[in-house]
Design a protein with these regions (language model features):
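ATP-dependent carboxylate/acyl-activation modules
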Residues: 1-8, 98-101, 184-188, 192-423
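Glycine-rich nucleotide/cofactor/substrate-binding loop typically near the N-terminus or early
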Residues: 35-106
Length: 423
């Protein structure tokens, strides 16, 4: 049966104009709330305000508007159940065939460094998840849309299927909804849990969308997948698909390089630094120091820098076989040179996003569950070193500076190992 009635209530209005106009062209009655209703009316579309539809006003500054039998009854009652249909008619409940809802931006709000608890709480959506879940539960009859990326697909399908969507599409959209609401609730749980040290000990929630299938795991016969917002931190500009070990190497490289303020180059293999060099001005000089530490390490390894990749260094690297190159930015000449390395994975690192991400604990699987550990974000400074002098002759300032540099490198080495580095 063709979609006849739709309820639209969104925070993100991306693509909404085209979608709403498309629904209107199919003769779909539009019901909406607050700012979304005003937006649709501004487009010249006929819209029924939710308060007119339910017969009840929006209350408590919009906190209560869609939690009503006219809404949830219209979503939940089964069209193939005679008793449901009878009760709906007796209570004046009309079927709502499509729900388009995206949620208050809670995750974006709490990601702000200066967010207050009150601001965070106001971005906890109640009506939105409730409508999404009601519609998703009854996906046999209701099309539920939680992502603007699905708007065009739905309109295309309505065009093909006489104003309706297929059961398979509705099922897929319902699964997407439950993933979204699960992610949303986990974000709220973790944020509020972090406000209380006691509550974080009781449980820990992990839920993230699939980012991409990885090329393989530790070995080619092992499947691997990457979840979460990795791409917001590390943007792959070119090269082969990432593998499981590539992702670990990229994380290790970021941990290493963000400890240094001066121009620095790191070379890593299997997450361990093999050479690190630093210079006051020129990345090429820093590279030369790192390279001379172990001239074999760059081949098939990971190279990371904490300054924009320059043409000079890119020219050197373009002649070497490397698996991954990471930089906060690449100038045009450097990109042109590195593009010739078609298989090399060129990564742009969003340093600010990485520094936020590394506040989260390290998570590792364990039999029957997983473990968490606070990430080692402490940086050993000169004051720390001077306080621990136990030799008869105290180190010189130059020696202390060298120790600090080497300490920051050696903390990235796993297990028992010796490491040489030059500043």
């Amino acid at each position: 049966m063709a979609i006849q009635r739709a309820l639209i209530s969104v925070s993100d209005k991306t693509g909404l104009e085209e979608f709403a106009k498309g629904l209107h062209e199919f003769g779909v009655e539009l019901i909406s709330t607050g700012g979304t209703a005003a937006f649709l009316k501004g487009l010249g579309l006929p819209v029924i305000e939710i308060s007119d539809y339910t017969g009840e006003p929006e209350l408590f500054e919009g906190r209560l508007k869609t939690l009503h039998p006219m809404v949830h009854g219209g979503l939940l009652h089964r069209r193939d159940n005679e008793e449901h249909v009878r009760q709906a008619k007796e209570n004046g409940i009309k079927p709502i065939d499509l729900v388009c809802v995206n949620l208050y931006p809670f995750e974006e709000t709490v990601a702000k460094p200066d967010v207050t608890l009150e601001e965070a709480i106001e971005k906890i959506d109640i009506g939105g998840p409730s409508m999404l879940r009601s519609a998703a539960k009854n996906y046999a009859s209701v099309t539920v849309v939680s992502d603007p990326a699905d708007y065009a697909r739905i309109l295309d399908e309505m065009q093909t299927h006489k104003g309706d969507t297929t059961l398979k599409t509705r099922e897929n959209l319902a699964v997407k909804v439950f993933m979204r609401t699960s992610n949303y609730d986990n974000a709220i749980t973790n944020y509020l849990g972090h406000q209380s040290a006691e509550s974080t000990k009781g449980s820990f929630c992990i839920c993230a969308p699939l980012y991409q299938e990885l090329r393989y795991g530790d070995n080619p016969h092992q499947e691997a997948s990457l979840y979460g917002s990795f791409g917001d931190i590390f943007n792959q500009l070119q090269g082969k698909e990432l593998s499981y070990t590539n992702v670990l190497d990229i994380e290790g490289a970021a941990e290493l390089i963000t400890q240094f303020r001066r121009p620095t180059v790191g070379i890593l293999k299997h997450t361990n630094p093999c050479g690190v060099g630093q210079d006051d001005e020129d990345l090429r000089n820093a590279w030369q120091k790192a390279f001379e530490t172990d001239t074999q390490a760059p081949f098939g390894g990971v190279i990371v820098v904490n300054r924009p990749m320059t043409e000079g260094l890119a020219r050197v690297l373009s002649a070497i076989f490397t698996d991954v190159i990471i930089a906060p930015e690449y100038d045009a000449e450097a990109r042109a040179l590195l593009q010739k390395k078609k298989n090399c994975r060129i990564i742009r690192m969003n340093t600010e996003a990485w520094m936020k991400a590394r506040r989260e604990p390290i998570i590792r699987s364990a039999p029957g569950g997983f473990m968490t550990m606070k990430r080692d974000t402490d940086v050993m400074g000169l004051d720390n070193l001077e306080a621990k002098v136990v030799t008869k002759r105290p180190p010189t300032e130059e020696e202390l500076t060298a120790m600090r540099f080497n300490w920051r490198v050696v903390k990235q080495v796993h297990s028992n190992a010796g490491l040489c580095s030059c500043r």
